[in-house]
Amino acid sequence: VAVTDAAFAFVVYVLVAGRYNFETLLQYIASGLTGHAAFSGGIAGIGYAALGFGIHVGISAGFVVVYALLIAPRVRTRGAAAAAGVLYGALIWLFMNTVVLPLGRSTHEPFFNGYYIAFLIEHAVLVGLPIALILFGDNGSRKSSLPSA
């Protein structure tokens, strides 16, 4: 989910809006932790971009763990998993934009920037939904496809 989210952000901010390149997009993520220094050029800039990618993957993994522990055990049907995933993805976007980004050291986008609807839908469909559907298949309440010992 971290990769699909990053790919969507790349399309919107790099290809459509022309506001970043791929490196500066990842540096923007790192700047939440390090401030403006993340926009350094050269080798340091590449390091900050790698840090940004790591932060993005780490946050995404955290959201997967939260879903796996708190929501997945309660979901009984694929339809319920899909609905829970879409809602969860939208809540991730809301949490990131109202709590995490404002607490960071970066200069973040206004809450209602020109792309907020696109990113809200993207988080619902490309982040929350895959988390829910993938983890639905691993829910221990259904018969496992693996042979038992």
Locations of regions flagged by a protein language model:
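Interfacial helix-loop-helix junctions of multi-pass membrane proteins
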Residues: 98-120
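Extracytosolic (periplasmic/ER-lumenal) interhelical loops and adjacent juxtamembrane/interface segments
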Residues: 14-47
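Hydrophobic alpha-helical transmembrane segments
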Residues: 50-68
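N-terminal signal-anchor transmembrane alpha helix
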Residues: 1-19
